[in-house]
Amino acid sequence: MDDFPSPEPTDPRLEAMAQKVLEETIITEGDGTIYWALKVTRLLSRVAKKHQCFEAFYDAVIKGDPKTRCCPAHNEKLIGNFGRAIMCVLRAFRFPVIRYESQVKSILTCRHAFNSHSRNVCLNPYHYRWVELPTCQVPPIIVNKELDYGEPPIRTEDALDDWNQKDLKEEQVVASWDVPNVTMRGDEIKLLYDRYAAENGDFQYMNYGNFGSFDGSPCSSTTMSLGSSFASLLQQSNRQDDEEPGYYRSGLSSPASHAASPREFIPNGNDTISLDQEMMDDSEVSDIMHSENFSSENNGNRKPTYADGRPITPIEPRPLYRSSALELGDLSRQAGIYECVEYEESPSWLKLIYYEEGTMIGEKADVEGHHCLIDGFTASRTDSETRSRFSLGWYNNPNRSPQTAEVRGLIGKGVRFYLLAGEVYVENLCNIPVFVQSIGANMKNGFQLNTVSKLPPTGTMKVFDMRLFSKQLRTAAEKTYQDVYCLSRMCTVRVSFCKGWGEHYRRSTVLRSPVWFQAHLNNPMHWVDSVLTCMGAPPRICSSRT
């Protein structure tokens, strides 16, 4: 956001409101100082005074109570890069991660409910609530305990250590392999919220223009499109997936992957009655009711018929069980053979490991909350009460190279990870590109699995698709231990700042990138571990740290 001079002296009430500006907003939108917060507060106060609602606005910001009064005002565009008034208010005092108007809704008690087509809005930041997306529901994994799954893997005490060590060793081996590159252009987080709004009839938030695309560039070897219009978005949303049940999935697959059926469940044939038996149009029902052959009392052998004389076959209720005692005995014996492994969610959903070239710097960091900021500043882990911030500038390395120091100085606002509807997205907040390697994203988009994607500034992309992962895990559980074990790679995402690697770069491996980190998704990785244990793999080897 642009700077503009702050007048002297400062109103004490403005200083009090500036203290309420969120720290993450000051970092990602401003210059990291309280002076920027004062500038934003003064700008918003001018808007409130212009519409004679400053007292109500001040009262709402200080008290932080939804019961405070409404602050009606025009949703005018502010000077500089502050955007619309309501977005600036919400970003400053309530939601530091808000990007679109479709991410919030007015509370029921607000007398000036927000509408993107209306000129007037309520500036009270506590008269809005965050739109909670429904979590992607996945079926449990069914494991047959009597199958031969081959030789089980050797698992160490920590599942993360297994793949962390293997990845670094294999990087040396596959350094000579070709790693494709692609440039990602588009906003998959916006597509996620636009799709949700379309499914729920919130068309006031929809943007009928182009949503963006994957654009081929001199450094990209693949070009993809995220969707060209709102019509194509709805078409993909309503398309049915004939291969498997249509469990709800938020987000939009690229054209290279199979589109899923949103918010619906396709029942199997055993649970349904044929349409011929179940449904009749109004005219047919009328013909039956007025037919002389229709009688509520079935005298003799007379049966109800249609008007043209065709007999009506009654639908008999199904018995609870149609199995013999022997069949029920087989079912009870099979209950001990098959076991379901449910997906479980833990608050600590993300683990970060920071590297400078091939050297791990610092310790692993666990992340809680629905989003995590990885920036280039110097805040320590103890400074973040919510454990949702990871500052690379805090870590020292006495053997740091000049190139690494230069890249660290360019990171700035960094990147942000989101956990939305059970799936993971990445947003680039830097002024420099970042390079992302995600097997899950590559599989979803139809890329080669080791493809490295260049994400330009302000870009977003989905790096973990829960529904796709569930399908792969369900298939692997019918094969071998190694097939299941290898899916841990889908739970790892690599992100490099400024310097990419692959066939279009001098660096053939991520180990030569100056500044990068690995993000491990704890919940899917734990699911893989639970399936392995259920399949009969030996328990993890305990060490002296146990």
UniProtKB/Swiss-Prot annotation:
One of its GO terms (molecular function) is DNA-binding transcription factor activity, RNA polymerase II-specific. Probably a receptor-regulated SMAD (R-SMAD) that is an intracellular signal transducer and transcriptional modulator activated by TGF-beta-like daf-7 signaling. Plays a role in TGF-beta-like daf-7 signaling in regulating entry into a developmentally arrested larval state known as dauer, in response to harsh environmental conditions; partially redundant with R-SMAD daf-14. Plays a role in inhibiting mitosis and promoting a switch to meiosis in the germ line, perhaps by down-regulating lag-2 transcription in the gonadal distal tip cells (DTCs). The keyword GTP-binding does not apply. It is found in: Cytoplasm; Nucleus. GO terms for cellular component: cytosol; heteromeric SMAD protein complex; nucleus. It holds the Pfam family MH2. Belongs to the dwarfin/SMAD family. Residues 292-302 have a biased composition (Polar residues). It comes from the Eukaryota. This is Smad protein daf-8. GO terms for biological process: activin receptor signaling pathway; anatomical structure morphogenesis; cell differentiation; dauer entry; dauer larval development; defense response to Gram-negative bacterium; determination of adult lifespan; egg-laying behavior. PROSITE patterns: MH1 (PS51075), MH2 (PS51076). Residues 16-137 form the MH1 domain. Residues 349-546 form the MH2 domain. Keywords: Cytoplasm, DNA-binding, Metal-binding, Nucleus, Transcription, Transcription regulation, Zinc. Expressed in the excretory cell and gonadal distal tip cells (DTCs). Residues 234-268, 292-317 are annotated as: Disordered. Homodimer. Interacts with R-SMAD daf-14 and co-SMAD daf-3. Interacts with orphan nuclear receptor nhr-69. PANTHER family: MOTHERS AGAINST DECAPENTAPLEGIC HOMOLOG, SMAD. Its main location: cytoplasm. The keyword Transport does not apply. SUPFAM superfamilies: SMAD MH1 domain (SSF56366), SMAD/FHA domain (SSF49879). Changing residue 502 to E: In sa234; constitutive dauer formation at 25 degrees Celsius.
